[in-house]
Amino acid sequence: MLFCLRSCHVSLEDKLQSEPSPELISSSISTPGRRAAIDRSTRETQVTLRLDLDGTGGADVRTGVGFFDHMLELVAAHGLFDLTVRAEGDLETGAHHTVEDVGICLGAALAQALGDKRGLIRYGSAVVPMDEALVLVALDLSGRPYFAYEGGPVGEAVAGFEASLVPEFFRALANNAKLTLHVRVLARGDFHHTVEAVFKGFARALRQAVSVDPRAYGVPSTKGVL
């Protein structure tokens, strides 16, 4: 993916009116502190995303996919991140492109906001119940992208959000954040409850991993780099 530096203060309308190129129209990153701003535009989607890892859990999300908006709001609330997302995609063909591209942007934002990862806890895990559903999430800010997903719903959907979109989102996020992510559904129940537990578990695990260890000053690896 080609990234170019430019001002983050570009409206989604301005991007939509720009002249398209064959694939990626534009993408830009700005990362003051533990914040990141991503603008990504293709023929299929236009995504603007702002992330503050040291936020208060505030979310302002509009992707055109209501259930997905709710899940991203849960990530912000349970991770204590501030998250703003604006996405416009080819929803007439389904939500796949929009969900995947938001995952790409959130992963890229995480990678940029974390910088060289000095002083971080690095690892995080959570076991989250949602009534009858139970989900385990474990992650490592390893610099090595890997995603594993076991036991999740298959062939179900709610409000146009299909079960297959859950792994698609997290795979895109893990690849672009360069993190190792394991999601295991230990007890599957109602589709909404199961997916909600997955997103909450991810948020809780990530909140732990990106926390700063006051006793650590270097990169949390004997290699000296992640």
Located regions from the model:
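Structural preference for solvent-exposed beta-strand-turn elements
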Residues: 12, 16-226
